[in-house]
Amino acid sequence: MLLSSCNGKSTINDDNNGDTITFKYAEHITAVRHDGYVDVKLSNPWKSGTILHRYALINRSDSGKVIPPSDATVIYTPIRRAIVTTSPHCRLLFDLGAGEAIKGVCDLAYITQQDVLQRAAKGTITNCGNSMSPTIERIIALAPDAMFLSPFEGSSHAQLENIGTPIIECADYMETSALGRAEWMRFYAMLIGKENTADSLFTTIEHNYNTIVEHNKKQKNHPKVLTERVTSGVWYCPGGNSSMAKLIKDAGGDYIFADDTHSGSLNLSPEMVISKAINADIWLFIYYGDRPLTRNQLNTEYSGYKTIKAFKDGNIYECNGKTSTYFEEISFRPDFLLTELTHMFYSQNNKLRYYKRIQE
């Protein structure tokens, strides 16, 4: 380890490789541990070969002792005051035992986690408004150590950066495997001082997931699977290289767009999807509503649905995002969703965690 002294502080020689922290599944994180400093680089999932964000994670006890690289955002760990803009990351922090660090959230109306709702009602968590345009005054008042948010291609955080708020770019959703996305919990754990907890939890998730995959490889039948439904004239389906498509495969299903190479969402015409889905054995989708949907409602919504085999056979499964914990859990507990899909594909189990079979 090569260190040089500058005004009593140590600066780390970037030419030294340090100790690499291995990520087994996540493709967009590299981390190197130095003495009192962890250098984390998030690769840009939208532009190969470039860096989305670089962080210097410095333990609070070493504050002032290290001069980080000039292109790195400094995060003093463990984070004590965080604003979290997505429900999955709220849930993760609670699962890792760091829920008390959450001082603000965005899009409170879409959060179903009781811990967050109760604290928001008491005023110990502040609603910072819409995640796409958060209320700057509330953020300033909270004086967070960092703000967790999900980036998108071409997104800018200039307004937040101008007020000095360190941004944690939660690009985990761009991973192409479910375990790759879940493994980001190990990065987030570095920020909150819960590395051992995250390592233990991820080991459990990995074991559960891979055990189910090995079991499903023995299945001889592979039901054809259709996902989602028409929205404003467009049928949005997961790309064939998405984590959802791979989950379906790992559960033993044959996703109708498995041969597609996109990792993001496909924006398709209803007619095109129907032509591929006419023989689909299972149809599952997510919606927001106050009550369960019926087949009659679906038929009224779009008459083409009734030509799908799964519609005729009654193998339609709905997940109500308004009341389910689906969005809060599945990002970092893919083993839960894999178990659910396996039950749907093979056991016709009606006691499911997220989905319900449409009865009418």
What are these model-derived regions, one by one?
Residues M1-S4:
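Sec-dependent bacterial lipoprotein signal peptides
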Residues C6-C90, T197-L226, K312, T325, ...:
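Bacterial Sec-exported substrate-binding components of ABC uptake systems
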Residues W46-I140, M147-L149:
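A short, structured surface patch at a secondary-structure boundary
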Residues A72, T77-R81, L92, T124-N130, ...:
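Second-shell loop/turn segments in exported
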Residues H89, F94, V105-D115, S155-H157, ...:
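Extracytoplasmic ligand-binding site segments that recognize negatively charged/polar headgroups
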Residues L179-T204, F285-E360:
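Structured C-terminal subdomain patch of bacterial secreted/periplasmic proteins
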Residues H207-N296:
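Flexible, glycine-rich surface segments
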